[in-house]
Amino acid sequence: MGKVIGIDLGTTNSCVAVMEGTQPRVIENAEGARTTPSIVAFTDDGERLVGQPAKRQAVTNPERTFFAIKRLIGRTYDDPLTQKDKGLVPYKIARGDNGDAWVEADGKKYSPSQISAFTLQKMKETAESHLGQPVTQAVITVPAYFNDAQRQATKDAGKIAGLEVLRIINEPTAAALAYGLDKKKAGTIAVYDLGGGTFDVSILEIGDGVFEVKSTNGDTFLGGEDFDNRVVEYLTAEFKKEQGIDLTKDKLALQRLKEAAEKAKIELSSATQTEINLPYITADASGPKHLALKLSRAKFESLVDDLVQRTIEPCRKALKDAGVSASEIDEVVLVGGQTRMPKVQEVVKAFFGKEPHKGVNPDEVVAIGAAVQAGVLQGDVKDVLLLDVTPLSLGIETLGGVFTRLIDRNTTIPTKKSQVFSTAEDNQNAVTIRVFQGEREMAADNKLLGQFDLVGIPPAPRGMPQIEVTFDIDANGIVNVTAKDKATNKEHQIRIQASGGLSDADIEKMVKDAEANAEADKKRRELVEVKNQGESLIHATEKSVAEYGDKVSAADKGAIESAITALRSALEGEDAEGIKAKTNDLMQASMKLGEAMYAASQTEGAPGADGAASTDEKKDDVIDADFQEVDENERKKRA
């Protein structure tokens, strides 16, 4: 059995880790970095870029560069948060055929699961390169507050990337696993996880290798991206005030502003002031315009104060659901890059009444925890038991549109719960089971996960038939629902799939696309390599012809020059095999030149050989003597 890897699929950055013996290890990517930007881009010629290469070209290619895609995963196009996101990103968010939010580039639509799969593929390749063997299984993390549709979409992304997702694990729980793996002391901890796009807080009890989640809460649309956007809004407002030009309509300018905002935010975690300089940000009739202004930490904190405060209410709810007070928390663990901000640390300290623990790397701890869970599933990590919870209540719509809960939030998973319902009308022969997830009292205010019909119920007065509805939540937090007519034992079971969501056929098509793209990427890489070889050979051959061309016949020299011309012509095309053939022809034609170079070097070396011989002849007149430098003090000692 191959290694199971742990992947933190983040909004801003992703990270992959693996167990090496009893210790988890974060794996560096091809660029030598321990985290990879969760960014995917398509170039003019259709090449796909993932990670740092995609991030580097974002400024010049904003409409084809997809970032923060995790905010769209498992969401419908009509979701208010999707509509909000449309105004924040330079790329196009379109309605998918299934009603979900998809993205579009050059007229081609991609599901968020598909874009996420490209990042997961990069993580998979990073691990394979390090391990030297194929990787087919993974544990992938998600925000604790992700609903069923978002979890299912993440699992689909893994499948598209060629990974069997053995477990979907909550990010704060993964962080707690990493934090508590070597800790001997039992206690209650709070994991405060403020990442690039999402916020979670979980309360856990840890002791004797048991990690029990008592409660979780959060906001799946609150993170570092929002902090960056506040700085961008401030910069555009200031520029408009000074220059009278609105930069919000200029996608290239916005992308530059976004990068500058992120950089300024990071700098303000250690400095009290930073300078933002963006020359040639735009131009008008009077000429080019430059943006230059100073941003203080105090000003930045005032811009984002409400975002920081928004994290406190979920903390309050999580403590209440866990039945503990802030003073009963033994340790507060900070996770996610945004927790490096001093103001965030200050607010957390004020709320929990204690200095937060900063001993874990907030960018890597989640991937490390995922690797630990992978080790548990593989049997490499012993004596660790993880008990997680479902973040949101689950139930069905009953008469009058009421939301009837079957499983309450923060119930330990896996879990199974049944309840008997009946018909609302006389002689009703079918019922529609509509499954919702959320905390509101009316079904319509919660998230519709899916629906199905149970048909063939024998005619009977209302309230007589007995329909047993069973909810089954697996360890991934993914829901299965069964409805059974107890009179006929007729049963209907579904794995809940969001009213949108990807069908098995969609996923299969995307898997095939991913495989085809992998083949295309391989061919593109091969083409670059053979072109490089061809160009190097031309350069080396031309240099040799300049030096030794007079040592070969005119016919041989002519053959070499023809072969160079033919290879140059081939290099202008895209035919790798053709370039290989012409490279080979040039190598064959250059053989005579190689012989001439070898002969010339032999001739040049001959006088040197004679000289060596004459030295040997005089050897008898030379007296060999060993000598040694002796320190003055050493000499006195010896005397």
From Swiss-Prot:
Q: Per the record, which residues fall in region Disordered?
A: 598-639
Q: What is the protein named?
A: Chaperone protein DnaK
Q: Which InterPro entries match?
A: ATPase_NBD, Chaperone_DnaK, Heat_shock_70_CS, HSP70_C_sf, HSP70_peptide-bd_sf, Hsp_70_fam
GO MF annotation terms: ATP binding; ATP-dependent protein folding chaperone; unfolded protein binding
Could you list the residue ranges that cross the membrane? none
User: Which organism's genome codes for this protein?
Assistant: Methylorubrum extorquens (strain CM4 / NCIMB 13688) (Methylobacterium extorquens)
| Cross-referenced Gene3D superfamilies | 1.20.1270.10, 3.30.420.40, Actin, Chain A, domain 4, Substrate Binding Domain Of DNAk, Chain A, domain 1
In the record, the note on similarity to other proteins reads: Belongs to the heat shock protein 70 family.
PTM-bearing positions, type Phosphothreonine:
T198
Q: Which UniProt keywords apply?
A: ATP-binding, Chaperone, Nucleotide-binding, Phosphoprotein, Stress response
Role summary: Acts as a chaperone.
Comp. bias regions, Acidic residues: 623-632
Expression triggers: By stress conditions e.g. heat shock.
Q: Which PANTHER family match?
A: HEAT SHOCK PROTEIN 70KDA
